[in-house]
């Protein structure tokens, strides 16, 4: 969809990519064999807590993978990816595009990494690739919500040119609590 289509009032037809590659990283949909590796992240406060992942177990993730993710993807609600290092044959974390709004041409990006994958540019390159795909395919605005105080995630977004737009009170879950989130956004014109 072109920007002129957006101006004419047509709804966006953005489609989530099946997979994306950047350097040695492959962003692809999760498969059953990934669950045992990624499930601990959903219970580890050092990982899941920073990314506001729900504290679920492997059985719940299997059900989500089979029964929920395909429908959510088809409806434009969520495209979940694992981040795989193809050189090391290792899962490093996850990323997502979600909350696609076809009327406003907006999508939200999210990401999380295992502690061992941090500090290597994995989050920055993954978010950049997802953002590039979105803005090259008709998305006018990419948003991200980061728990207030999660400076590592804030730095990822700032490096990529996302602008800090404000704080949403009690917007994210952090364990059993509701916490404030900083809203970041990048416009297609900014890229």
Where are these regions (language model features)?
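GNAT-family acyltransferases
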Residues: 1-116, 133, 178-191
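Structural signature of beta-strand start/N-cap positions in the alpha/beta core
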Residues: 26, 140-141
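Conserved functional loop/turn residues at catalytic and ligand-binding sites
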Residues: 34, 46, 117, 121, ...
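Positions that flank functional sites
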Residues: 57, 149, 172
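Conserved phosphate-binding and hydrolysis motifs of nucleotide-dependent enzymes
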Residues: 93, 150, 161
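Conserved acetyl-CoA-binding loop-helix of GNAT-fold acetyltransferases
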Residues: 111-112, 119-136, 151-159
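Conserved catalytic-core motifs of GNAT/GCN5-like acyltransferases
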Residues: 143-146, 163-181
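Conserved active-site tyrosine of GNAT-family acetyltransferases
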Residues: 157, 162, 184
């Amino acid at each position: 969809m072109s920007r002129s289509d957006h101006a004419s009032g047509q709804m966006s037809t953005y489609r989530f990519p099946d997979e994306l590659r950047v350097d040695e990283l492959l962003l692809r949909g999760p498969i059953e064999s990934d669950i045992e590796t990624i499930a601990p992240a959903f219970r580890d406060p050092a990982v899941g807590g920073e990314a506001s992942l729900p504290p679920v177990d492997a059985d719940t993730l299997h059900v989500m993978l089979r029964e929920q993710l395909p429908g959510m993807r088809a409806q434009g609600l969520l495209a979940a990816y694992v981040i795989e290092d193809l050189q090391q044959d290792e899962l490093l974390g996850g990323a997502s595009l979600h909350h696609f709004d076809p009327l406003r041409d907006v999508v939200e990006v999210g990401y999380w990494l295992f502690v061992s994958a941090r500090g290597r540019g994995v989050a920055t390159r993954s978010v950049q690739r997802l953002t590039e795909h979105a803005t090259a395919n008709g998305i006018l605005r990419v948003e991200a919500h980061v728990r207030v105080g999660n400076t590592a995630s804030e730095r990822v977004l700032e490096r990529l040119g996302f602008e800090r737009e404000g704080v949403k009170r009690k917007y994210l879950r952090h364990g059993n609590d509701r916490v404030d989130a900083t809203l970041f956004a990048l416009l297609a014109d900014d890229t």
